[in-house]
């Protein structure tokens, strides 16, 4: 093999070219590739985080929905209990009012009955005196009449 100056020149030129590329061309290319790899990795990591965040948000929303349903059921249950309590109180008040009205009615009936009895006694006494007057065929003065009526009422 013949080594001539052209081959040595080409070898030196190639070595300088490789050194130049390694010194000035290769580092920016490697930086660009590394930056792109980093951006892609960051994008994938962000996508994974977004998926995890979405899953957490969905789980949280599901939990909140369940909690809201439980709370709504509790509120409905409390409302039904309150409704039953109000109805029971109304029934109790109505029963008390009914008993009061019945007692008041009975008292009024008893008072009216006593008044009617008293009137009837007076009428019976008056009739008895009138009958006695007719029998005796004489008239009694009003003071004596009143006295006799009172005595008869007391006896009856």
UniProtKB/Swiss-Prot annotation:
Would the keyword Membrane be found if you checked this record's keyword annotation? yes
Provide the topology term for how it sits in the membrane.
Single-pass membrane protein
Keywords of the record, alphabetical order, are: ATP synthesis, Cell inner membrane, Cell membrane, CF(0), Hydrogen ion transport, Ion transport, Membrane, Transmembrane, Transmembrane helix, Transport
Question: For this UniProt entry, what is the primary localization, expressed as one broad class?
Answer: membrane
Transmembrane stretches, start-end: 7-27
Name where it's found: Cell inner membrane
One Gene Ontology cellular component annotation?
A: proton-transporting ATP synthase complex
Q: Does the keyword Transport apply?
A: yes
Name the Gene Ontology molecular function terms of this record: proton-transporting ATP synthase activity, rotational mechanism; proton-transporting ATPase activity, rotational mechanism
**CDD domains referenced in this protein's UniProt entry, alphabetically:** ATP-synt_Fo_b
Quote the subunit structure annotation: F-type ATPases have 2 components, F(1) - the catalytic core - and F(0) - the membrane proton channel. F(1) has five subunits: alpha(3), beta(3), gamma(1), delta(1), epsilon(1). F(0) has three main subunits: a(1), b(2) and c(10-14). The alpha and beta chains form an alternating ring which encloses part of the gamma chain. F(1) is attached to F(0) by a central stalk formed by the gamma and epsilon chains, while a peripheral stalk is formed by the delta and b chains.
Q: Which family does it belong to?
A: Belongs to the ATPase B chain family.
UniProt-listed HAMAP family = ATP_synth_b_bprime
What this chain does, per the record? F(1)F(0) ATP synthase produces ATP from ADP in the presence of a proton or sodium gradient. F-type ATPases consist of two structural domains, F(1) containing the extramembraneous catalytic core and F(0) containing the membrane proton channel, linked together by a central stalk and a peripheral stalk. During catalysis, ATP synthesis in the catalytic domain of F(1) is coupled via a rotary mechanism of the central stalk subunits to proton translocation.
- Can you say what this protein is called? ATP synthase subunit b
**Protein encoded by which gene:** atpF
């Amino acid at each position: 093999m013949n080594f001539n100056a052209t081959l040595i020149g080409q070898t030196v030129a190639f070595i300088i070219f490789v050194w130049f590329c390694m010194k000035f061309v290769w580092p920016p290319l490697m930086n660009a590739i590394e930056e792109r790899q980093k951006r892609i990795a960051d994008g994938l990591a962000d996508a994974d985080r977004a998926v995890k965040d979405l899953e957490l948000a969905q789980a949280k929303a599901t939990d909140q929905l369940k909690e809201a349903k439980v709370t709504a059921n509790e509120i409905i249950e409390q409302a039904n209990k309150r409704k039953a309590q109000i109805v029971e109180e109304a029934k109790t008040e109505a029963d008390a009012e009914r008993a009061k009205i019945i007692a008041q009615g009975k008292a009024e009936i008893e008072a009216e009955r006593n008044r009617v009895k008293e009137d009837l006694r007076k009428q019976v006494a008056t009739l008895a005196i009138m009958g006695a007057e007719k029998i005796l065929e004489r008239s009694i003065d009003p003071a004596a009449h009143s006295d006799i009526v009172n005595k008869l009422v007391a006896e009856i």
